[in-house]
């Protein structure tokens, strides 16, 4: 995810193996869904998706392309 804090972006693609994609889908990260970056601390993110705040480490966040 490359965007600024407070900016709403749309998920274009999710990369990784099937297990990673399934995990992210279960959290609500689906292609076409809008997300907002709430906080970025050294690449570790807190994002708002569907009204929920989710923490992602740098490696997991890198799998979500916007």
Residue ranges and their predicted role:
Residues 1-66:
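Compact, glycine-rich, soluble single-domain proteins
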């Amino acid at each position: 995810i490359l965007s600024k804090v407070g900016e709403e972006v749309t998920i274009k693609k999710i990369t990784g193996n099937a297990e990673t994609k399934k995990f992210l889908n279960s959290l609500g990260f689906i292609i076409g869904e809008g997300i907002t970056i709430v906080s970025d601390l050294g690449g570790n993110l807190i994002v708002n998706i569907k009204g929920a705040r989710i923490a992602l480490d740098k490696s997991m966040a890198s799998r979500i392309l916007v």
